[in-house]
Amino acid sequence: MIENNAAYLQTLGQQAKQASYALAGLTGQQKQALLSAIAGSLTKNSATILAANAKDVVAARSNGLNDAMIDRLLLDESRLQGVIGDIDNVINLTDPVGTELESQVLDNGLRLSRRRVPLGVIGVIYEARPNVTVDIAVLALKTGNAVILRGGKETLQSNLALSEAIRAAVVEQGLPADSVQLIQSPDRALVSGLLKLDQFVDMIVPRGGQNLQRLCAEQATIPVILGGIGICHLYADKDADIAKSIAVIANAKVQRPTVCNALDTVLVHEAIADQLLPQLYTHLAASGVTFYGCQSAQAIADKLGVAISIATEETYGQEWLSLTLGVKVVSDIDTAIDHIRTYSSGHSEGILTDSIHASAHFVNEVDSAAVYVNASTRFTDGGQFGLGAEVAVSTQKLHARGPMGLEALTTYKWIGVGEYTARS
Protein backbone atom coordinates (compact mmCIF):
# COMPACT_ATOMS: atom_id res chain seq x y z
CA MET A 1 0.00 0.00 0.00
CA ILE A 2 1.43 3.37 -1.06
CA GLU A 3 0.59 5.99 1.58
CA ASN A 4 1.56 9.10 -0.37
CA ASN A 5 1.20 8.90 -4.14
CA ALA A 6 2.85 12.24 -4.83
CA ALA A 7 5.93 11.44 -2.75
CA TYR A 8 6.15 7.94 -4.23
CA LEU A 9 6.08 9.25 -7.81
CA GLN A 10 8.50 12.06 -6.97
CA THR A 11 10.98 9.47 -5.70
CA LEU A 12 10.50 7.29 -8.79
CA GLY A 13 11.08 10.28 -11.04
CA GLN A 14 14.19 11.45 -9.22
CA GLN A 15 15.67 7.96 -9.25
CA ALA A 16 14.92 7.49 -12.94
CA LYS A 17 16.48 10.84 -13.86
CA GLN A 18 19.65 10.00 -11.94
CA ALA A 19 19.84 6.58 -13.58
CA SER A 20 19.41 8.14 -17.02
CA TYR A 21 22.68 10.04 -16.61
CA ALA A 22 24.58 6.78 -16.10
CA LEU A 23 22.83 5.10 -19.03
CA ALA A 24 23.47 7.97 -21.44
CA GLY A 25 27.22 7.42 -21.21
CA LEU A 26 27.20 3.69 -22.00
CA THR A 27 29.09 2.44 -25.02
CA GLY A 28 27.44 0.17 -27.55
CA GLN A 29 29.44 -2.76 -26.20
CA GLN A 30 28.28 -2.09 -22.65
CA LYS A 31 24.66 -2.01 -23.81
CA GLN A 32 25.11 -5.32 -25.62
CA ALA A 33 26.46 -6.87 -22.41
CA LEU A 34 23.56 -5.41 -20.43
CA LEU A 35 20.92 -6.86 -22.75
CA SER A 36 22.65 -10.24 -22.76
CA ALA A 37 22.64 -10.17 -18.96
CA ILE A 38 18.90 -9.42 -18.97
CA ALA A 39 18.24 -12.41 -21.24
CA GLY A 40 20.28 -14.57 -18.87
CA SER A 41 18.48 -13.29 -15.79
CA LEU A 42 15.05 -13.92 -17.32
CA THR A 43 16.12 -17.46 -18.17
CA LYS A 44 17.51 -18.01 -14.68
CA ASN A 45 14.32 -16.71 -13.06
CA SER A 46 11.87 -18.31 -15.51
CA ALA A 47 10.28 -20.59 -12.90
CA THR A 48 9.57 -17.60 -10.63
CA ILE A 49 8.18 -15.60 -13.56
CA LEU A 50 5.89 -18.40 -14.73
CA ALA A 51 4.63 -19.00 -11.18
CA ALA A 52 3.81 -15.29 -10.84
CA ASN A 53 1.99 -15.35 -14.17
CA ALA A 54 0.00 -18.39 -13.06
CA LYS A 55 -1.26 -16.32 -10.10
CA ASP A 56 -2.36 -13.57 -12.49
CA VAL A 57 -4.21 -16.10 -14.66
CA VAL A 58 -6.01 -17.61 -11.66
CA ALA A 59 -7.03 -14.14 -10.48
CA ALA A 60 -8.18 -13.19 -13.99
CA ARG A 61 -10.40 -16.26 -14.22
CA SER A 62 -11.89 -15.63 -10.79
CA ASN A 63 -12.61 -12.04 -11.83
CA GLY A 64 -14.48 -13.21 -14.94
CA LEU A 65 -12.07 -12.04 -17.63
CA ASN A 66 -12.86 -13.49 -21.04
CA ASP A 67 -10.69 -16.05 -22.81
CA ALA A 68 -9.23 -13.48 -25.22
CA MET A 69 -8.02 -11.30 -22.34
CA ILE A 70 -6.62 -14.29 -20.47
CA ASP A 71 -4.75 -15.35 -23.60
CA ARG A 72 -3.19 -11.89 -23.80
CA LEU A 73 -1.83 -12.05 -20.26
CA LEU A 74 -0.75 -15.70 -20.37
CA LEU A 75 2.95 -16.56 -20.26
CA ASP A 76 3.93 -20.19 -20.73
CA GLU A 77 7.40 -21.63 -21.24
CA SER A 78 7.22 -21.22 -25.01
CA ARG A 79 6.03 -17.61 -24.89
CA LEU A 80 8.62 -16.66 -22.29
CA GLN A 81 11.38 -18.18 -24.40
CA GLY A 82 10.05 -16.18 -27.34
CA VAL A 83 10.26 -12.97 -25.30
CA ILE A 84 13.83 -13.82 -24.27
CA GLY A 85 14.73 -14.69 -27.85
CA ASP A 86 13.49 -11.29 -29.01
CA ILE A 87 16.20 -9.68 -26.87
CA ASP A 88 18.80 -11.15 -29.21
CA ASN A 89 17.05 -9.41 -32.11
CA VAL A 90 17.37 -6.07 -30.31
CA ILE A 91 21.02 -6.76 -29.46
CA ASN A 92 21.70 -7.20 -33.18
CA LEU A 93 20.05 -3.91 -34.14
CA THR A 94 22.26 -0.91 -34.88
CA ASP A 95 22.49 1.42 -31.89
CA PRO A 96 21.36 4.86 -33.11
CA VAL A 97 22.83 6.77 -30.15
CA GLY A 98 25.92 8.77 -31.06
CA THR A 99 25.17 8.82 -34.78
CA GLU A 100 26.21 12.10 -36.39
CA LEU A 101 23.23 13.21 -38.43
CA GLU A 102 24.90 16.15 -40.16
CA SER A 103 27.91 18.41 -39.83
CA GLN A 104 29.24 21.59 -41.33
CA VAL A 105 31.85 24.27 -40.78
CA LEU A 106 30.34 27.74 -40.55
CA ASP A 107 31.92 30.83 -42.13
CA ASN A 108 33.24 31.85 -38.72
CA GLY A 109 35.08 28.53 -38.37
CA LEU A 110 32.65 26.95 -35.89
CA ARG A 111 32.39 23.19 -36.51
CA LEU A 112 28.70 22.41 -36.02
CA SER A 113 27.20 18.92 -35.88
CA ARG A 114 23.92 17.27 -34.91
CA ARG A 115 24.20 14.06 -32.90
CA ARG A 116 21.57 11.50 -31.87
CA VAL A 117 21.20 11.15 -28.07
CA PRO A 118 18.83 9.39 -25.62
CA LEU A 119 15.58 11.07 -24.63
CA GLY A 120 16.30 10.53 -20.93
CA VAL A 121 13.36 9.07 -18.99
CA ILE A 122 10.41 7.38 -20.67
CA GLY A 123 7.11 6.54 -18.99
CA VAL A 124 5.07 3.73 -20.51
CA ILE A 125 1.50 2.89 -19.51
CA TYR A 126 0.18 -0.39 -20.85
CA GLU A 127 -2.42 -3.05 -20.30
CA ALA A 128 -2.56 -6.83 -19.94
CA ARG A 129 0.50 -7.95 -21.91
CA PRO A 130 3.43 -8.92 -19.66
CA ASN A 131 5.80 -9.26 -22.64
CA VAL A 132 5.58 -5.47 -23.00
CA THR A 133 7.48 -5.13 -19.71
CA VAL A 134 10.50 -6.81 -21.28
CA ASP A 135 10.12 -5.28 -24.76
CA ILE A 136 9.99 -1.71 -23.46
CA ALA A 137 12.76 -2.13 -20.90
CA VAL A 138 15.11 -3.63 -23.47
CA LEU A 139 14.43 -0.96 -26.10
CA ALA A 140 14.81 1.82 -23.53
CA LEU A 141 18.13 0.48 -22.24
CA LYS A 142 19.44 -0.15 -25.76
CA THR A 143 18.98 3.57 -26.42
CA GLY A 144 20.40 4.71 -23.07
CA ASN A 145 17.06 5.67 -21.49
CA ALA A 146 15.68 5.00 -18.04
CA VAL A 147 12.07 3.82 -17.95
CA ILE A 148 9.12 3.93 -15.56
CA LEU A 149 6.59 1.19 -16.31
CA ARG A 150 2.95 1.07 -15.31
CA GLY A 151 1.33 -2.21 -16.42
CA GLY A 152 -2.24 -3.38 -16.07
CA LYS A 153 -3.52 -4.63 -12.74
CA GLU A 154 -4.28 -8.00 -14.37
CA THR A 155 -0.56 -8.69 -14.82
CA LEU A 156 0.86 -7.10 -11.66
CA GLN A 157 2.48 -10.28 -10.31
CA SER A 158 3.99 -11.13 -13.70
CA ASN A 159 5.33 -7.62 -14.16
CA LEU A 160 6.85 -7.59 -10.67
CA ALA A 161 8.71 -10.83 -11.36
CA LEU A 162 9.86 -9.71 -14.80
CA SER A 163 11.02 -6.28 -13.63
CA GLU A 164 12.92 -7.75 -10.68
CA ALA A 165 14.77 -10.13 -13.01
CA ILE A 166 15.64 -7.21 -15.29
CA ARG A 167 16.77 -5.02 -12.39
CA ALA A 168 18.99 -7.82 -11.08
CA ALA A 169 20.78 -7.92 -14.43
CA VAL A 170 21.13 -4.13 -14.46
CA VAL A 171 22.78 -4.17 -11.03
CA GLU A 172 25.00 -7.09 -12.08
CA GLN A 173 26.35 -4.84 -14.84
CA GLY A 174 27.22 -2.11 -12.33
CA LEU A 175 24.33 0.18 -13.25
CA PRO A 176 21.57 1.74 -11.12
CA ALA A 177 18.68 -0.64 -10.42
CA ASP A 178 16.38 2.33 -10.93
CA SER A 179 17.17 2.34 -14.63
CA VAL A 180 14.00 0.22 -14.81
CA GLN A 181 11.19 0.91 -12.33
CA LEU A 182 7.71 -0.55 -12.11
CA ILE A 183 4.84 1.26 -10.42
CA GLN A 184 3.86 -1.44 -7.93
CA SER A 185 0.25 -0.50 -7.34
CA PRO A 186 -2.92 -0.72 -9.47
CA ASP A 187 -4.14 2.62 -8.07
CA ARG A 188 -5.31 4.60 -11.09
CA ALA A 189 -4.48 7.87 -9.36
CA LEU A 190 -0.83 6.99 -9.92
CA VAL A 191 -1.39 7.15 -13.68
CA SER A 192 -2.66 10.72 -13.41
CA GLY A 193 0.32 11.57 -11.21
CA LEU A 194 2.80 10.02 -13.64
CA LEU A 195 1.34 12.11 -16.46
CA LYS A 196 2.29 15.27 -14.57
CA LEU A 197 5.84 14.26 -13.65
CA ASP A 198 7.34 16.60 -16.25
CA GLN A 199 10.24 17.56 -13.98
CA PHE A 200 11.71 14.11 -14.53
CA VAL A 201 9.93 12.27 -17.37
CA ASP A 202 10.66 13.27 -20.97
CA MET A 203 8.02 11.28 -22.86
CA ILE A 204 4.91 9.23 -22.11
CA VAL A 205 3.82 6.32 -24.30
CA PRO A 206 0.34 4.93 -23.58
CA ARG A 207 -0.34 1.48 -25.02
CA GLY A 208 -4.03 0.87 -24.62
CA GLY A 209 -7.54 1.68 -25.77
CA GLN A 210 -9.34 4.93 -26.44
CA ASN A 211 -10.05 5.69 -22.78
CA LEU A 212 -6.36 5.51 -21.86
CA GLN A 213 -5.35 7.55 -24.91
CA ARG A 214 -7.92 10.22 -24.06
CA LEU A 215 -6.85 10.33 -20.40
CA CYS A 216 -3.23 10.87 -21.39
CA ALA A 217 -4.07 13.52 -23.99
CA GLU A 218 -6.19 15.47 -21.51
CA GLN A 219 -4.09 15.21 -18.35
CA ALA A 220 -0.44 14.96 -19.37
CA THR A 221 1.96 17.86 -18.91
CA ILE A 222 4.62 15.73 -20.64
CA PRO A 223 4.84 15.08 -24.41
CA VAL A 224 2.66 12.04 -25.17
CA ILE A 225 2.94 9.68 -28.13
CA LEU A 226 -0.65 8.79 -29.00
CA GLY A 227 -1.60 5.83 -31.14
CA GLY A 228 -2.30 2.14 -31.13
CA ILE A 229 -5.95 2.64 -32.08
CA GLY A 230 -6.31 1.22 -35.56
CA ILE A 231 -9.43 1.82 -37.63
CA CYS A 232 -7.86 0.30 -40.74
CA HIS A 233 -9.18 0.23 -44.31
CA LEU A 234 -8.52 -1.59 -47.57
CA TYR A 235 -9.97 -0.24 -50.82
CA ALA A 236 -10.46 -2.67 -53.73
CA ASP A 237 -10.23 -0.53 -56.85
CA LYS A 238 -12.00 -1.23 -60.14
CA ASP A 239 -8.68 -2.50 -61.55
CA ALA A 240 -7.97 -4.89 -58.68
CA ASP A 241 -7.15 -8.57 -59.18
CA ILE A 242 -10.14 -10.11 -57.45
CA ALA A 243 -8.63 -13.42 -56.32
CA LYS A 244 -5.47 -11.79 -55.00
CA SER A 245 -7.49 -9.03 -53.33
CA ILE A 246 -9.64 -11.54 -51.45
CA ALA A 247 -6.51 -13.26 -50.14
CA VAL A 248 -5.08 -9.96 -48.86
CA ILE A 249 -8.38 -8.88 -47.29
CA ALA A 250 -8.70 -12.24 -45.55
CA ASN A 251 -5.16 -11.98 -44.20
CA ALA A 252 -5.79 -8.46 -42.90
CA LYS A 253 -9.04 -9.47 -41.18
CA VAL A 254 -8.62 -13.06 -40.02
CA GLN A 255 -4.95 -13.67 -39.19
CA ARG A 256 -5.03 -11.81 -35.84
CA PRO A 257 -8.31 -9.92 -35.51
CA THR A 258 -7.58 -8.62 -31.99
CA VAL A 259 -4.61 -6.42 -32.91
CA CYS A 260 -4.55 -2.77 -33.93
CA ASN A 261 -3.36 -3.40 -37.52
CA ALA A 262 -6.23 -5.77 -38.33
CA LEU A 263 -8.69 -4.67 -41.01
CA ASP A 264 -11.91 -2.96 -39.90
CA THR A 265 -13.58 -1.80 -43.13
CA VAL A 266 -13.24 -2.89 -46.75
CA LEU A 267 -14.28 -0.45 -49.47
CA VAL A 268 -15.14 -1.92 -52.88
CA HIS A 269 -15.49 -0.09 -56.20
CA GLU A 270 -18.99 -0.55 -57.59
CA ALA A 271 -17.59 -1.83 -60.90
CA ILE A 272 -16.29 -5.02 -59.25
CA ALA A 273 -18.65 -5.35 -56.27
CA ASP A 274 -20.85 -8.01 -57.91
CA GLN A 275 -17.77 -10.12 -58.64
CA LEU A 276 -15.70 -9.58 -55.51
CA LEU A 277 -18.21 -9.44 -52.68
CA PRO A 278 -19.93 -12.84 -53.18
CA GLN A 279 -16.54 -14.57 -53.07
CA LEU A 280 -15.37 -12.42 -50.17
CA TYR A 281 -18.49 -13.06 -48.09
CA THR A 282 -18.26 -16.82 -48.64
CA HIS A 283 -14.54 -16.91 -47.86
CA LEU A 284 -14.69 -14.80 -44.71
CA ALA A 285 -17.94 -16.28 -43.37
CA ALA A 286 -16.21 -19.67 -43.35
CA SER A 287 -13.72 -18.16 -40.90
CA GLY A 288 -16.47 -16.85 -38.64
CA VAL A 289 -16.46 -13.22 -39.83
CA THR A 290 -19.66 -11.22 -39.38
CA PHE A 291 -20.50 -8.16 -41.45
CA TYR A 292 -21.89 -4.64 -41.30
CA GLY A 293 -22.55 -3.17 -44.73
CA CYS A 294 -24.10 -0.37 -46.75
CA GLN A 295 -27.33 -1.03 -48.67
CA SER A 296 -25.48 -2.20 -51.80
CA ALA A 297 -23.25 -4.52 -49.79
CA GLN A 298 -26.30 -5.81 -47.94
CA ALA A 299 -28.20 -6.54 -51.16
CA ILE A 300 -25.38 -8.74 -52.45
CA ALA A 301 -25.13 -10.56 -49.12
CA ASP A 302 -28.89 -11.15 -49.04
CA LYS A 303 -28.75 -12.93 -52.42
CA LEU A 304 -26.23 -15.36 -50.94
CA GLY A 305 -28.09 -15.82 -47.69
CA VAL A 306 -25.14 -14.34 -45.78
CA ALA A 307 -26.15 -12.58 -42.56
CA ILE A 308 -25.25 -8.89 -42.57
CA SER A 309 -26.26 -5.94 -40.42
CA ILE A 310 -26.76 -2.44 -41.75
CA ALA A 311 -23.73 -0.20 -41.25
CA THR A 312 -24.06 3.14 -39.45
CA GLU A 313 -21.87 6.14 -38.71
CA GLU A 314 -20.98 4.46 -35.43
CA THR A 315 -19.98 1.12 -36.95
CA TYR A 316 -17.81 2.74 -39.62
CA GLY A 317 -15.89 4.46 -36.84
CA GLN A 318 -15.39 1.25 -34.86
CA GLU A 319 -12.10 -0.51 -34.21
CA TRP A 320 -13.52 -4.03 -34.08
CA LEU A 321 -10.64 -6.06 -32.57
CA SER A 322 -12.76 -9.09 -33.47
CA LEU A 323 -14.02 -11.10 -36.45
CA THR A 324 -16.31 -8.29 -37.57
CA LEU A 325 -15.90 -6.34 -40.81
CA GLY A 326 -17.48 -3.23 -42.25
CA VAL A 327 -18.24 -3.35 -45.99
CA LYS A 328 -19.03 -0.40 -48.23
CA VAL A 329 -19.50 -0.13 -51.99
CA VAL A 330 -18.18 3.16 -53.38
CA SER A 331 -18.58 4.88 -56.74
CA ASP A 332 -14.91 5.77 -57.25
CA ILE A 333 -11.50 6.09 -55.62
CA ASP A 334 -12.14 9.61 -54.33
CA THR A 335 -15.26 8.47 -52.51
CA ALA A 336 -13.15 5.76 -50.88
CA ILE A 337 -10.53 8.33 -49.88
CA ASP A 338 -13.22 10.62 -48.44
CA HIS A 339 -14.56 7.73 -46.36
CA ILE A 340 -11.07 6.99 -45.03
CA ARG A 341 -10.51 10.66 -44.19
CA THR A 342 -13.77 10.67 -42.24
CA TYR A 343 -13.40 7.47 -40.24
CA SER A 344 -9.72 6.49 -40.13
CA SER A 345 -7.66 6.77 -36.95
CA GLY A 346 -4.59 7.45 -39.10
CA HIS A 347 -3.06 4.01 -38.52
CA SER A 348 -2.97 1.85 -41.69
CA GLU A 349 -4.81 1.94 -45.01
CA GLY A 350 -4.27 0.20 -48.34
CA ILE A 351 -5.36 0.06 -51.96
CA LEU A 352 -5.69 -3.11 -54.03
CA THR A 353 -5.25 -2.31 -57.71
CA ASP A 354 -3.25 -3.00 -60.86
CA SER A 355 -3.45 0.67 -61.84
CA ILE A 356 -0.26 2.67 -61.31
CA HIS A 357 -2.25 5.91 -61.53
CA ALA A 358 -4.79 4.80 -58.91
CA SER A 359 -2.13 3.56 -56.50
CA ALA A 360 -0.14 6.80 -56.79
CA HIS A 361 -3.29 8.87 -56.25
CA PHE A 362 -4.23 6.85 -53.16
CA VAL A 363 -0.76 7.03 -51.63
CA ASN A 364 -0.59 10.79 -52.18
CA GLU A 365 -4.06 11.55 -50.84
CA VAL A 366 -4.39 9.22 -47.83
CA ASP A 367 -2.75 10.70 -44.74
CA SER A 368 -2.08 7.78 -42.40
CA ALA A 369 1.02 6.50 -40.64
CA ALA A 370 1.26 3.56 -43.06
CA VAL A 371 -0.23 3.41 -46.56
CA TYR A 372 -0.01 0.22 -48.61
CA VAL A 373 -0.35 -0.75 -52.25
CA ASN A 374 -1.42 -4.37 -52.78
CA ALA A 375 -0.45 -5.42 -49.26
CA SER A 376 -2.12 -6.26 -45.96
CA THR A 377 -2.48 -3.71 -43.16
CA ARG A 378 -1.02 -6.40 -40.89
CA PHE A 379 2.49 -5.32 -41.91
CA THR A 380 2.35 -2.24 -39.66
CA ASP A 381 4.59 -3.71 -36.99
CA GLY A 382 8.08 -2.95 -35.72
CA GLY A 383 9.32 -6.46 -36.38
CA GLN A 384 7.90 -6.53 -39.91
CA PHE A 385 9.46 -3.13 -40.63
CA GLY A 386 12.87 -4.36 -39.47
CA LEU A 387 12.82 -2.15 -36.37
CA GLY A 388 12.93 -4.99 -33.86
CA ALA A 389 10.38 -4.96 -31.04
CA GLU A 390 8.30 -1.78 -31.11
CA VAL A 391 7.49 0.62 -28.31
CA ALA A 392 4.12 1.45 -29.86
CA VAL A 393 2.50 2.45 -33.15
CA SER A 394 2.12 6.22 -33.26
CA THR A 395 -0.75 7.73 -35.23
CA GLN A 396 0.35 11.31 -34.61
CA LYS A 397 2.78 13.33 -36.68
CA LEU A 398 5.17 14.98 -34.24
CA HIS A 399 8.35 13.20 -33.14
CA ALA A 400 7.33 9.68 -34.24
CA ARG A 401 4.85 8.18 -36.69
CA GLY A 402 4.02 4.53 -37.29
CA PRO A 403 5.87 1.70 -35.55
CA MET A 404 8.29 3.18 -33.02
CA GLY A 405 11.68 1.49 -32.96
CA LEU A 406 14.98 2.55 -31.45
CA GLU A 407 15.32 5.91 -33.23
CA ALA A 408 11.94 7.01 -31.84
CA LEU A 409 13.44 6.74 -28.33
CA THR A 410 16.13 9.28 -29.16
CA THR A 411 16.39 12.97 -29.86
CA TYR A 412 19.38 15.02 -30.99
CA LYS A 413 21.65 17.74 -29.73
CA TRP A 414 23.66 20.37 -31.59
CA ILE A 415 27.39 20.41 -30.85
CA GLY A 416 29.51 23.40 -31.76
CA VAL A 417 33.32 23.23 -31.57
CA GLY A 418 35.29 26.43 -32.01
CA GLU A 419 38.74 27.91 -31.50
CA TYR A 420 37.64 30.12 -28.61
CA THR A 421 35.22 31.51 -31.18
CA ALA A 422 33.13 34.55 -30.23
CA ARG A 423 30.12 35.76 -32.16
CA SER A 424 30.77 38.94 -34.09
Swiss-Prot record:
<keyword id="KW-0963">Cytoplasm</keyword>
<dbReference type="Pfam" id="PF00171">
    <property type="entry name" value="Aldedh"/>
</dbReference>
<dbReference type="GO" id="GO:0050661">
    <property type="term" value="F:NADP binding"/>
</dbReference>
<dbReference type="InterPro" id="IPR020593">
    <property type="entry name" value="G-glutamylP_reductase_CS"/>
</dbReference>
<keyword id="KW-0560">Oxidoreductase</keyword>
<keyword id="KW-0028">Amino-acid biosynthesis</keyword>
<dbReference type="InterPro" id="IPR016161">
    <property type="entry name" value="Ald_DH/histidinol_DH"/>
</dbReference>
<comment type="similarity">
    <text>Belongs to the gamma-glutamyl phosphate reductase family.</text>
</comment>
<dbReference type="InterPro" id="IPR016163">
    <property type="entry name" value="Ald_DH_C"/>
</dbReference>
<dbReference type="GO" id="GO:0004350">
    <property type="term" value="F:glutamate-5-semialdehyde dehydrogenase activity"/>
</dbReference>
<dbReference type="InterPro" id="IPR000965">
    <property type="entry name" value="GPR_dom"/>
</dbReference>
<dbReference type="GO" id="GO:0005737">
    <property type="term" value="C:cytoplasm"/>
</dbReference>
<keyword id="KW-0521">NADP</keyword>
<dbReference type="InterPro" id="IPR016162">
    <property type="entry name" value="Ald_DH_N"/>
</dbReference>
<dbReference type="InterPro" id="IPR012134">
    <property type="entry name" value="Glu-5-SA_DH"/>
</dbReference>
<keyword id="KW-0641">Proline biosynthesis</keyword>
<comment type="pathway">
    <text>Amino-acid biosynthesis; L-proline biosynthesis; L-glutamate 5-semialdehyde from L-glutamate: step 2/2.</text>
</comment>
<protein>
    <recommendedName>
        <fullName>Gamma-glutamyl phosphate reductase</fullName>
        <ecNumber>1.2.1.41</ecNumber>
    </recommendedName>
</protein>
<comment type="function">
    <text>Catalyzes the NADPH-dependent reduction of L-glutamate 5-phosphate into L-glutamate 5-semialdehyde and phosphate. The product spontaneously undergoes cyclization to form 1-pyrroline-5-carboxylate.</text>
</comment>
<dbReference type="InterPro" id="IPR015590">
    <property type="entry name" value="Aldehyde_DH_dom"/>
</dbReference>
<dbReference type="GO" id="GO:0055129">
    <property type="term" value="P:L-proline biosynthetic process"/>
</dbReference>
